[in-house]
Amino acid sequence: MTVKEKIEQLRLQLHQHNYNYYVLNAPEISDKEFDDLMRELQDLEQEHPEYKDENSPTMRVGSDINKNFTQVAHKYPMLSLSNTYSENEVTDFYDRVRKALNEDFEICCEMKYDGTSISLTYENGKLIRAVTRGDGEKGDDVTDNVKTIRSIPLVLHGDNYPEVFEIRGEILMPWEVFEALNREKEAREEPLFANPRNAASGTLKLQNSAIVASRKLDAYLYYLLGDNLPTDGHYENLQEAAKWGFKISPLMRKCQTLQEVFDFINYWDVERKNLNVATDGIVLKVNSLKQQRNLGFTAKSPRWAIAYKFQAERALTRLNMVTYQVGRTGAVTPVANLDPVQLSGTVVKRASLHNADIIEGLDLHIGDMVYVEKGGEIIPKITGVDTSVRFMIGEKVKFITHCPECGSKLIRYEGEAAHYCPNETACPPQIKGKIEHFISRKAMNIDGLGPETVDMFYRLGLIHDTADLYRLTTDDIRGLDRMGDKSAENIIKGIMQSKEVPFERVIFALGIRFVGETVAKKIAKSFKDIEELENADLETLINIDEIGEKIARSILNYFANESNRKLVDRLKTAGLQLYRPEEDLSGHTDKLAGQSIVISGVFTHHSRDEYKDLIEKHGGKNVGSISSKTSFILAGDNMGPAKLEKASKLGIKIMNEEEFLKLIS
């Protein structure tokens, strides 16, 4: 046997043993025997790099190379499902499907696993790409990290799979792994993960795949897409996918009647507590792919599927005290400190009280027995008080009047429930919160910096605001606690690299109230530089797509503050991209000036976001709904029948991709 043949043999053996252990849960060899085979393969691959294969089992161990994720457009948009919490709405969904199809249909009921969504692409039986849901149009390429998940096959079994296809599913962190990870974080005095979903999502986005490999993520796959799929049945296709090596949930049922659907829901509403992974509902899908196509999509979700969410679990425990947290915007949040209680698979010690009105409405007293719920929320919340056991009335909980961090008198804006600390330039949590937001991945994305490092730099007087980051040198931070030469160099390198971050993300990084990622993009496309934005009036801001008076006034208030203007000037001096690059400004025309355009369907040549950019680049305006003022509809495949009917009724022109591209060329 040649070396190459031996390597191939070991790879096949290890792929099979991975499948036996992680998917079938039926190992045929011991862990030691598996490790010995893996070590033998690693040695041979190291000695013979000419036989390197990206899909080798050895690629699952992860790498400590730190790199940014690239964004990849989804071939098929990853839409979210419509949610329902009532059986009446499930009945309405069933009736809508029956009326629209006017023929027999089956509903496939599946567990709704509570993790992070993933889309896997396979070509010729090999995993070539793994992409997160992102915004539904495009997501992060996390292929290297996903390759560390043992239940996801790198190479498929058999040979009857399509040449190219996508399969989607949920990346999960089992309860046992989640609890062990939080015990480790607690021992290191690090912030705990709130739930397995956050832990799985956070792990998948780590830029060190060796750590990802150590976190023992799992995956269930639940939807197959592509041409030449085995059958017209969604359920049947998943059974075929299981034969190819995918981990498909056995907790599925094809239902012929609505009563069978409810039987499935009611059974798992009780039994889900015994599962080793988090679930939060049941997904209902029309089983026939042909019928799915006939039903089509709305702008946000498929008409052939719905998610029934389980009611939040609740528990009774004692309220010991109320503490207060100050966020980066100055919002003060009351937090209930409780006797530990088991809820939804985790031990709950704290719960949000949200604001003064909630506290007053609950008539809370220290020592009360309170009901705690945990639904989709990250932090549990108190929903009621058991006054029947209030024998000894403790001190009534009253919302504080002054900031717990800096002592400033709190204010409450008209029409808002929250109280705020107005001392935004000298209140420590606000300053640190603004810096943490500034360095975050979706903002300036500064590698090596995190909350602990920011806290240390702030305590030592090295930074007082975001602009101070750009004055730091390696000598300033070398030798600090857990800060060696390499760590110091990486942080300074990350800070310098952030100067290349585009205008829209710098706007988002400023932390202007109500200005999220989407609004920041709209602003960046509407002004050539920060000076134009600083000097914009209310009318100019309101005329920007998706910006109302509330956001516009927040922007005006931000730049009316002299401290903020000085900060922006210092960031500009530091070299940040507070302007649109020349290439962005070139190519603009007025070919679509004055036209309001609706985008609908799935596209081939560009993504929906790219078409929105093209519309704005040529002077047009993107609008979300059809009205008599709509100029035309840019339509791709699977345009919703409701939009089609409304466009026809109003006599609005429908334009395909080719016609649109010709129009703007």
From Swiss-Prot:
Cofactor: Mg(2+); Mn(2+)
EC id: 6.5.1.2
Gene Ontology cellular component list: cytosol
Annotated GO biological process: DNA repair; DNA replication
Gene3D superfamilies hit by this protein: 5' to 3' exonuclease, C-terminal subdomain, 6.20.10.30, BRCT domain, DNA ligase/mRNA capping enzyme, Helix hairpin bin, Nucleic acid-binding proteins
InterPro entries according to UniProt: BRCT_dom, BRCT_dom_sf, DisA/LigA_HHH, DNA_ligase, DNA_ligase_CS, DNAligase_adenylation, DNAligase_N, Hlx-hairpin-Hlx_DNA-bd_motif
Positions bound to NAD(+): 31-35, 80-81, 110, 133, 170, 285, 309
Uppermost EC category: ligase
Annotated residues for binding of Zn(2+): 403, 406, 421, 427
Catalysed reaction, written as an equation: NAD(+) + (deoxyribonucleotide)n-3'-hydroxyl + 5'-phospho-(deoxyribonucleotide)m = (deoxyribonucleotide)n+m + AMP + beta-nicotinamide D-nucleotide
Biological role: DNA ligase that catalyzes the formation of phosphodiester linkages between 5'-phosphoryl and 3'-hydroxyl groups in double-stranded DNA using NAD as a coenzyme and as the energy source for the reaction. It is essential for DNA replication and repair of damaged DNA.
Similarity annotation: Belongs to the NAD-dependent DNA ligase family. LigA subfamily.
Annotated protein name in UniProt: DNA ligase
Organism: Bacteroides fragilis (strain YCH46)
Gene that encodes it: ligA
